[in-house]
Amino acid sequence: MTGSSLTRTLLLFKTLWGWSDSLDLASERAQREGFDGLEVNLDHPCLESMPAVEVRRRLDRCEQRLIVEIVTGGDYTPSLQWSPDDHLAQLDQDLKRATALQPEKINLITGSDSWSDPIQDDFLAALLDRIEAVPVGVMLETHRSRSLFDPWRLPSRLQRFPRLRLTADLSHWCAVTERLMTPDLAPVQAMAGRVDHIHARVGHPQGPSVSHPFAPEWAEALDAHRRCWQLFLDQSVPSDQPFTITPEFGPDGYMPQQPFSGEPLADVQAINAEMASWLRSSLTMPAADS
């Protein structure tokens, strides 16, 4: 036998972004919809005042795994008053809290797009030192308003920081660059072997979310994202750790709304379930070497 006999499994996670019910109801619905686990913000109301052991018990009852999301800076768009040291101080506390939940992985939305390149580099170096001590995989998300907001700077950062692992959310970069991300682009090529988790939302050149990924008017955008996601799977390092994807259509101005009424154009819960099913049939994990 030559090469590695390991092959990564693919797991799909249900996002609790915008979820207003209990953890129990989320776990039960995720199980019905065929998800393998939940992705939840560390400060989500459904976890409030619940001991870590109780969170695990409730997830295990529905055979659901867990990805924890940590957001620094006060909100998803970070306060400009927060310094790098402020972000790092929060991470010191939140990484301990997240680890206690025994997650599959931890996703970080951190840093600020307002910092200069030297400050960004110092922040990332300090952050990666902290991640070294965490017993589960920790990824930084390619999120607008954050340290990895700019795709064109990413290749040099990946060279500078070989320990940096990524959550790929290409929809943010569509909005930042006013173009679709495609597999031929330098940042997509550079990041392919560093991606451990995907946020599968479909963006377009004018925004981070289409109204419905399976509407025919968005076919080009869906296919561009799918080809990038498949590249990430193809370039993933053989491992006994699963590759994970979270369909992440959501609220907060991402899902377009009807004028005047403010009603969403589509049901994000239904879209995410449909997206998970589509991803299972449309993406292929590379076979193990033999």
Where are these regions (language model features)?
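N-terminal pre-domain/capping segments
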Residues: 1-93, 99, 273-290
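Charged helix-capping and loop-helix junction motifs
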Residues: 52-55, 84-91, 120-126, 151-155, ...
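Active-site acidic/histidine proton-transfer and metal-coordination neighborhood
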Residues: 80-165
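Hydrophobic faces of well-ordered beta-strands that scaffold small-molecule active sites
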Residues: 4-16, 38-40, 66-71, 106-108, ...
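Alpha-helix-loop-beta-strand connector modules within alpha/beta enzyme cores
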Residues: 55-74, 124-135, 161, 226-230
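Surface-exposed, active-site-proximal loop segments in enzymatic domains
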Residues: 72-89, 114-119, 209-220, 254-264
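Histidine-acidic metal/acid-base catalytic patches
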Residues: 2-5, 24-31, 155, 160-164, ...
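Active-site beta-loop-alpha junctions enriched in small/polar residues
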Residues: 13-18, 41-45, 71-75, 111-113, ...
